[in-house]
């Protein structure tokens, strides 16, 4: 009986710990668990000198809050696992 109770306690602790973490994409379909305190996934996109030939620059990751919007930078934030996909990834 004690073993069963101990097992239930351990499973509960593990499940609570796993439920508190967030995973975000950091690059092309490369996901990572966010550090403690970072509860938002984001995608930043902007044009640089090579935008015409290479497309927009993309930065992805985790943050404590949604990054501040600046001129010429598009930012999208979300708060579920791997929600910060990039539309141009396609289906491959």
Curated annotation (Swiss-Prot):
Top-level taxon in the UniProt lineage: Eukaryota
SUPFAM superfamilies reported for this sequence: Snake toxin-like (SSF57302)
Tissue and organ distribution: Expressed by the venom gland.
Cellular component aspect of the GO annotation: extracellular region
Disulfide feature: 24-41, 34-62, 47-51, 66-77, 78-83
MF-aspect GO terms: acetylcholine receptor inhibitor activity; ion channel regulator activity; toxin activity
Protein name, UniProt field: Alpha-elapitoxin-Lh2a
Organism listed in the record: Hydrophis hardwickii (Hardwick's spine-bellied seasnake)
Organismal lineage: Eukaryota, Metazoa, Chordata, Craniata, Vertebrata
